[in-house]
Amino acid sequence: MRHYYTADQIRAAEAPVLAALPDGALMRRAASGLATAVAAELRRRAGGVAGRVVCAVVGSGDNGGDALWAATFLRRRGVAAYAVLLNPGRTHAKALAAFRAAGGRVVGGGDVGVPDGTDLVIDGVVGISGTGPLRPAAAAIFAAVGQSGVPVVAVDIPSGIDVHTGAIAGPAARAGLTVTFGGLKPVHALADCGRVELVDIGLELPQTDLLGLDATDVAARWPLPGPRDDKYTQGVVGVLAGSAAYPGAAILCTGAAVAATSGMVRYAGPAAAEVVSHWPEVVAAPSAAEAGRVQAWVVGPGLGTDEAAFSALTFALSSDLPVIVDADALTMLARHPHLVSARAAPTVLTPHAGEYERFELGPVGDDR
């Protein structure tokens, strides 16, 4: 089980450790873990560590200090290390001194981009105390980095993303790897942080009610068929998707149901021949009414919004079965919300931002 902690919980857990350790020791401990992760990422992406080029984009907080110390440790492994200081007057002084003493080079202020030939960028702009989008100088740097395809390793969180909600209100760094310290934060579950690696820095963390499943938890809960099971005890999924214009949607949606280890998949709609040619184990019918016994429906992908499509949506939602509503079915449902207003059975809507807006439920957040 993954445990997630607020920024305040992390800071409270850090306080006794900071008091017990020499000044700067906890930062160097975190930076050592960061440097190890960056070295592994260099091997994975650039084929090695020594001789590779790393550039830290450094903000004014402790995250910038972490990035500078990590770059310092990487210098000792033969990495050419550069730093772009976004706020030179507020850069972590001891970390910057160590970086320069190790042969690291400062390439200018925030109006200067990362050097040509950089193999990896360390995002040390803002950490768990930061809020809001990237400021213009940092935004320009990370926009250029994104266009160049240079990989980014974020320190704690990708800068510009809200640590509590994962919301992105403007320019933000896009990281292929995020290295975080002490404990996971909500942002690591709510936003795209790339791969997330947790570095143990010796914090004693409290109990938390912010929990998430990992692969082991899912595997432990995943039902496995026994000797007395059949297709009905394992679940029969009915798929209402596709049309003459979009038969591929039916193929993809039905294939997803097959891959999800449903006990049986039934398809109902005009793309029956195409579906069965790709998935011969699927039982196909021309309409939902003729589909046979179903225990849950998915309706909408490529369905269209004509009368036949509306009939399929109505059929699914008028049942007492669980229904997933997606794509064209969401468009129709936004026009006819009464179809779900009195539903007691489980109903899952999966809108993207544009589909969400059609429901007129308020501003679109990153998690809709």
Each predicted region: which residue ranges?
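Polar low-complexity intrinsically disordered regions enriched in Ser/Thr and small residues
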Residues: 106-107, 111-113, 169, 305-307, ...
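Short beta-alpha junction loops
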Residues: 87-89, 157-159, 329
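N-terminal small/polar loop signature for handling phosphorylated ligands or for N-terminal nucleophile
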Residues: 69-147, 274-293
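Internal gly/pro-rich beta-alpha loop/helix module
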Residues: 118-120, 125-210
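Small-residue (G/A/S/T)-rich helix-start motifs and N-terminal tracts that mark the onset
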Residues: 1-85, 175-177, 185-327, 331-368
